[in-house]
């Protein structure tokens, strides 16, 4: 019998969202969605060459892990090395064993790589494109990873990307020399990314913060069995296009690079209406040499009937020797020097490690739930 007729709207998989800011939903992704991701990354021909290796450390049952870690490399003729149930402590050994030119992971993976004792004096010049997605990375953490890569003979810094399950994982990419520290790259070749007044189709000018929206060939078919939720995310604008409203706040610079601030749901709104972006604080605190990782969440404003205040969780560098009280004083001074008064954190809490979701994202909801009145 002949092949089945081609149906561009055929649902290939139903993938569940990560659920860090809401209940998980089944996302229907089509054959065209996945193929378009591979075809768009194929434009980076100087980075991806047939016969190279890609080590997939992401779960292949999420959109990021399958689209970028399995389908994309196979379409481009790469060999895929799948690492099931990755033990982060063994990441350095796996990189040295397989020497993959390419890897897609989350920021925590690259921080783990940069702290690997096994890789400390190794030549890693075989690395071509190691990319971070799935979660935000602070400027301080990105610079630390870039310093590690440069010191080990790697030509390019950490590549970053941005997307969501609803757009088949990727809408922007920063790789090779097309990269700016702090950005998540430029839109993929057939994808439009723009900034709108949240919840509307009013486009904002360059440099102004608003809701990041995406239009292109990799947008989902819809949420399985949830037409209302589908209509809320996929909206028809006056330009005739369908735009996915991401719920993320960011802006675009004059060179077309996209900068991500935070989820709209992560915004901390004070009692006086001022809005605090967690990333503003995280990017300052992460530059302190004693800080290995940090996350900012909102806590109840005990002095007012409404509003929330920024609260900082900090994971310290285990090799540091300063006392916590001294570090807090230095962090407060750093924030005072570089941030407006209304953005100042109300308190700092030191923890041994960040709680993570099963797909490697910081579990911000759990962090918020663990704050007690005694903490601030």
Q: Which residues make up each language-model segment?
A:
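AMP-binding/adenylate-forming catalytic domain of the ANL superfamily
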Residues: 339-362
């Amino acid at each position: 019998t002949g092949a089945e007729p081609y149906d561009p709207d055929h649902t290939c998989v139903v993938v569940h969202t990560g659920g860090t800011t809401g209940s998980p939903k089944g996302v229907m992704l089509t054959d065209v969605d996945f193929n378009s991701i591979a075809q768009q990354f194929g434009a980076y021909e100087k980075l991806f060459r047939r016969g190279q290796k890609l080590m997939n450390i992401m779960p292949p049952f999420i959109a990021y892990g399958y689209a970028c870690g399995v389908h994309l490399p196979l379409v481009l003729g790469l060999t895929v090395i799948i690492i099931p149930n990755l033990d982060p402590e063994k990441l350095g050994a796996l990189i040295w064993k397989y020497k993959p030119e390419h890897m897609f992971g989350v920021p925590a993976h690259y921080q783990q790589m940069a702290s690997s004792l096994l890789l400390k004096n190794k030549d890693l010049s075989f690395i071509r494109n190691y990319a971070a997605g799935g979660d935000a990375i602070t400027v301080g953490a990105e610079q630390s990873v870039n310093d590690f890569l440069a010191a080990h003979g790697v030509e390019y810094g950490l590549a970053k990307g941005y997307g969501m399950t609803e757009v088949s994982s990727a809408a922007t990419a920063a790789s090779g020399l097309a990269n700016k520290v702090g950005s998540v790259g430029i839109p993929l070749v057939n994808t439009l990314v723009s900034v709108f007044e949240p919840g509307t189709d009013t486009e904002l000018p360059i440099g102004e913060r608003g809701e990041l929206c995406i239009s292109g060939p990799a947008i989902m078919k819809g949420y399985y069995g949830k037409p209302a939720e589908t209509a809320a995310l996929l909206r028809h604008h006056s330009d005739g296009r369908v735009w996915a409203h991401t719920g993320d706040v960011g802006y675009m610079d004059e060179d077309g690079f996209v900068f991500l601030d935070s989820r709209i749901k992560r915004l901390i709104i004070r009692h006086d209406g001022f809005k605090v972006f967690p990333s503003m604080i995280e990017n300052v605190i992460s530059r302190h040499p004693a800080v290995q990782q940090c996350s900012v969440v909102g806590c109840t404003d005990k002095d007012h009937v409404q509003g929330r205040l920024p609260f900082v969780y900090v994971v310290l560098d285990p090799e540091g020797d300063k006392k916590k009280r001294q570090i807090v004083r230095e962090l407060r001074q750093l924030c005072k020097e570089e941030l407006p008064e209304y953005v100042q954190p109300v308190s700092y809490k030191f923890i041994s490690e960040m709680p993570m979701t099963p797909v490697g994202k910081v579990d911000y909801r759990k962090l918020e739930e663990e704050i007690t009145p005694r903490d601030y």
